[in-house]
């Protein structure tokens, strides 16, 4: 048996928040690669979306909503990579805000009901932000990264993301 059985998948009421945000950002940023994982030989510009571990109390309601702290990384190459990554970070903010104000939904993934900017886009010098003695590899020469953190609130989809096949 490969993967998990359909009847187990059908129990899920929420899909990964990244799946909803990938769909929203890909639609709102045509021509820009938007992903949740980095390829070994990545090309730029790039927007990377990742759910952060939550600290404190989770703000969702398992009957109706999900809540997530999400890190959004924007990468851009020279020339003008520093400015381009900053501008791309601002474009992401606008797309997410507009998705919230329009109650944007993605079938099987949910609806964005609120987006709060927790930490605005800021320049970072390596692949990921280190918060302890662990340090991450430097970015490729000529590539710039900005990181922002959002708190995203999601109403679960009307239909479960993985319904049983009929």
Where are the regions a protein language model picked out?
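Short acidic low-complexity segments
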Residues: 34-42
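A short, hydrophobic beta-strand-centered structural micro-motif
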Residues: 44-53
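Charged, amphipathic alpha-helical segments and their flanking helix caps
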Residues: 1-32, 53-166
């Amino acid at each position: 048996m490969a993967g998990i059985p359909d009847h187990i998948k059908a129990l899920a009421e929420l899909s990964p928040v990244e799946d909803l945000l990938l769909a929203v950002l890909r639609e709102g940023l045509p021509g820009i690669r938007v992903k949740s994982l980095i390829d070994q030989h990545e090309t730029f510009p790039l927007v990377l979306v990742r759910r952060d571990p939550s600290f404190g109390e989770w703000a969702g309601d398992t009957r109706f909503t999900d809540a997530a702290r999400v890190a959004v990384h924007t990468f851009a190459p020279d020339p003008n990579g520093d400015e381009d990554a900053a501008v791309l970070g601002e474009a992401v903010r606008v797309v997410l805000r507009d998705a919230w104000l329009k109650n944007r939904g993605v079938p099987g993934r949910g609806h964005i009901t609120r987006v709060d900017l927790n930490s605005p886009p800021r320049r970072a010098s390596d692949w990921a932000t280190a918060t302890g003695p662990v340090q991450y590899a430097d970015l490729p020469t000529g590539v710039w990264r900005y990181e922002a953190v959002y708190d995203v609130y999601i109403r679960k989809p009307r239909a479960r993301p993985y319904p049983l096949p009929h």
